[in-house]
Amino acid sequence: MSDEKAVRFAHWVFLLAGIVGLIEVTPLLFLENVIGVRQPPPITHPEFYYGFVVIALTWQIAFLIIALDPARYLPLLPVLFLEKLLYPIAVFVLYAQGRVTAQAFPGPILDLVWLALFVTVWVRLRRWRPGNT
């Protein structure tokens, strides 16, 4: 893959990650009660719920910023790997313990797809540095 294609690919991956993430996460700000009804019991610690939501929203904005200049933010990508890996691990452990059902899997599985794309971006961009020909 050429340098220009690697950067363009990275741009689109992070732009889409940010947009999709904002579309998925923003409604959670308004769904606390709905979640409590559809997946009892109700949320008993709203500070944890909203803390999770606003941190997730913050990362989506970070993805949009990274999309503007992916090569510049290359050193940050391993941290993004953790952001996309740790939640699925937590959900799969909770499932193994019988504390959540498979209904909790779509979000973590999507995170693993984004993880694969982020790793692909990292591998491709590491071969390229601005100013190299």
Model-derived regions, located:
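Membrane-water interface at the C-terminal end of transmembrane alpha helices
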Residues: V113-T133
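Core segments of alpha-helical transmembrane spans in multipass integral membrane proteins
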Residues: I19-L28, T44-L68, V79-L85
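Non-cytosolic membrane-interface motifs at loop->transmembrane helix junctions
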Residues: V37-P46, P75-V79, R99-L110
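Membrane-helix boundary connector in multi-pass membrane proteins
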Residues: P88-P106, V123-R124
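Membrane-embedded alpha-helical segments of multi-pass transporters/permeases
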Residues: L29, L64, F92, V119-W122
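Hydrophobic alpha-helical segments of small multi-pass membrane proteins
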Residues: L77-V91, G107-F118
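Membrane-helix boundary elements
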Residues: A6-P46
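Short, Lys/Arg-rich, polar N-terminal cytosolic tail immediately upstream
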Residues: M1-V7, N132
